[in-house]
Amino acid sequence: METIFDYNQIKEIIPHRQPFLLIDRVVEYEVGTRCVAIKQVSGNEPFFQGHFPEYAVMPGVLITEALAQTGAVAILNSEENKGKLAFFAGIDKCRFKKQVTPGDTLKLEVEITKMRGPIGKGNAKATVDGEVACSCELTFAIQAK
C-alpha cells in the first residue's frame, strides 16, 4: 500500500501527538469523505504495560480513538476545516470482534456519511488481516481553535 500521508504529514493535519497519536500513515484518502490509515501495533506501546502485562491486548477504546483520528484526517484536511479541531461526540453500534495484539497491522477505514453544519457522522471499521476487529458509527463535532 502506497503512503499518501506519512506520520509527520498526519501531525500537520490533526493535533494529536505521542503517546496519543494512534495512526502511522494514510494509504487511501478522499478529501472530506473517506480515509484509510494504518497502525502498526508494537509490543512497545505504552498501553500494553497495563493492558495486560501477561496478555497484551490493545484496549477497545483506543481502537475507536484510532478510527476517530482516521476520520479526523478526512475532515480536517479539507479547505474549510484546516486548522480546526474535531471532537468525538458519540459512538453507536460499536462491536469488538477480534483482539488486537502486538505485531498486528491495524487497518482503519472511515467513510463520512453525513455532515450537517459542524456535526458529522461516519461509518468506521478496523481490521487485522482482513478480519473485522471493530466496527462502529462515529459522531463528531468540528470546532475552531
From Swiss-Prot:
Pfam families in alphabetical order: FabA
Active site: 51
Cellular localization per UniProt: Cytoplasm
GO cellular component, one term: cytoplasm
Enzyme superclass (EC): lyase
Name the UniProt record assigns to this protein: 3-hydroxyacyl-[acyl-carrier-protein] dehydratase FabZ
InterPro entries the record matches: FabA_FabZ, FabZ, HotDog_dom_sf
Catalytic reactions on record: a (3R)-hydroxyacyl-[ACP] = a (2E)-enoyl-[ACP] + H2O
This protein's UniProt keywords: Cytoplasm, Lipid A biosynthesis, Lipid biosynthesis, Lipid metabolism, Lyase
EC number: 4.2.1.59
GO biological process, one term: lipid A biosynthetic process
Function summary: Involved in unsaturated fatty acids biosynthesis. Catalyzes the dehydration of short chain beta-hydroxyacyl-ACPs and long chain saturated and unsaturated beta-hydroxyacyl-ACPs.
Family: Belongs to the thioester dehydratase family. FabZ subfamily.
Primary localization: cytoplasm
Lineage: superkingdom: Bacteria
Entry GO MF terms: (3R)-hydroxyacyl-[acyl-carrier-protein] dehydratase activity
